[in-house]
Amino acid sequence: MAKRVRVGQIVNTQGVRGQVRLWPLTEKPSRFNEIKRVFVEAPPQGAPEVLTITSAHPLKKLVIVSFQEISDMTQAERLKGCYLTIPVEEVPAPEPDSYYHFQLEGLSVFTEAGERLGQIEEILETGSNDVYVVRQASPPGEVLIPALKSVVLKVDLAAGTMTVRLPDGLR
């Protein structure tokens, strides 16, 4: 099965014509106007696995989405809580020196001296910059690494590695 990336989560219905309120998992919610087909991750019994987007428009922090296959509130209700995904090949290329979270999660993190710190387990979105949660095997625990150009020296997606310069006192 091809790898898929989550692009949003259906949080509620909208109106009686089958529209849904979608929490976007993308920095640019306007992309839902470009996406034509989404997959429902673990769809409920009898719900469609593939949906065709017919319209999408922003509403505060959400996106109101209509699907060709969903025509009433009862059908839309069954999709509450479901994640929508697209094939990784359909994800637009990021800006230069930028990465999507799914590309960074799981990378092995090394110091500039070559010491293995661990693996990126999670990415926290804070106000000013992201923070990488790096799970350590020895000693057991985690290191929180700020996603700053002064800290992250190199990302090699092909090798599955990230090289960092730890700020003083981070350990």
Swiss-Prot record:
> Does the keyword rRNA-binding feature in the UniProt annotation?
no
Which biological process annotations from GO are given for this protein?
A: ribosomal small subunit biogenesis; rRNA processing
- Its main localization is cytoplasm
Which domain of life does the UniProt lineage start with? Bacteria
Please provide the record's keywords in A-Z order: Chaperone, Cytoplasm, Ribosome biogenesis, rRNA processing
Q: Where is it found, in Gene Ontology cellular component terms?
A: cytoplasm; ribosome
Q: Does the keyword Chaperone apply?
A: yes
Cell compartments where the protein resides: Cytoplasm
The record's GO molecular-function terms, alphabetically, read: ribosome binding
InterPro entries in the record, alphabetically? PRC_barrel-like_sf, PRC_RimM, RimM, RimM_N, RimM_N_sf, Transl_B-barrel_sf
Tell me which residues make up the PRC barrel domain: 96-170
The subunit structure is:
Binds ribosomal protein uS19.
Reported function: An accessory protein needed during the final step in the assembly of 30S ribosomal subunit, possibly for assembly of the head region. Essential for efficient processing of 16S rRNA. May be needed both before and after RbfA during the maturation of 16S rRNA. It has affinity for free ribosomal 30S subunits but not for 70S ribosomes.
The record's domain comment reads:
The PRC barrel domain binds ribosomal protein uS19.
Similarity field: Belongs to the RimM family.
Q: What is this protein called?
A: Ribosome maturation factor RimM
Tell me what gene encodes this: rimM
